[in-house]
């Protein structure tokens, strides 16, 4: 069996496992439950079909750059929906030590992916909105577009910081589904000199969906 065949077989086996998983929910609420598995729950809103590959739970590791130097982190991203015209987004990460073990909590963000709805401007209606609240004390609004069926690019349009929040610059993010069905991304942020510099990157494997 060639390496390519082995990769396909491994992906198929992984899909059989992840397809049976979903995020936990409380079953007594009188509204559609969140689901991170497109095989279960409400149908995905047609307005979100260009974001369909993102739905799921993703886990993996990445690299970050901070003032004290580079570091490695683990991360889980949950992308779910309830049939509405938005995707729920929750990302949390943790620092890893030199042995690849948990060291301490890291960055955390939560928010929503939406498409701009402007019947008067069909081109603008293809724009993505990503609204994020960060545990470090700031709120961020991204706008972007799908680059193709499996990659998306977004850039910060507005940023608001609380009095206790971290001082940060705007960012540019690129997400994509890559070889093996993994989710990869890179984030650049504006530094003190006003230029975009590498900040975060990660490769995550599907865990649910």
UniProtKB/Swiss-Prot annotation:
Chain location of the short sequence motif GXWXGXG per the record: 56-62
CC cofactor note: Binds 1 heme b group per subunit, that coordinates a highly solvent-exposed Fe(III) atom.
Chain sites annotated for binding heme b: 172, 199
EC numbers for this chain: 5.99.-.-
InterPro entries the record matches: Calycin, Nb(III)_bact/plant, Nitrobindin, THAP4-like_heme-bd
Pathway: Nitrogen metabolism
Essential cofactor(s): heme b
Catalytic activity annotation: peroxynitrite = nitrate
Role according to the record: Heme-binding protein able to scavenge peroxynitrite and to protect free L-tyrosine against peroxynitrite-mediated nitration, by acting as a peroxynitrite isomerase that converts peroxynitrite to nitrate. Therefore, this protein likely plays a role in peroxynitrite sensing and in the detoxification of reactive nitrogen and oxygen species (RNS and ROS, respectively). Is able to bind nitric oxide (NO) in vitro, but may act as a sensor of peroxynitrite levels in vivo.
Subunit-structure text: Homodimer.
Domain remark in the UniProt entry: Forms a 10-stranded antiparallel beta-barrel structure able to accommodate a hydrophobic ligand in its interior. In fact, this fold hosts the heme group, which is located in a wide surface cleft.
Family: Belongs to the nitrobindin family.
Protein name: Peroxynitrite isomerase 2
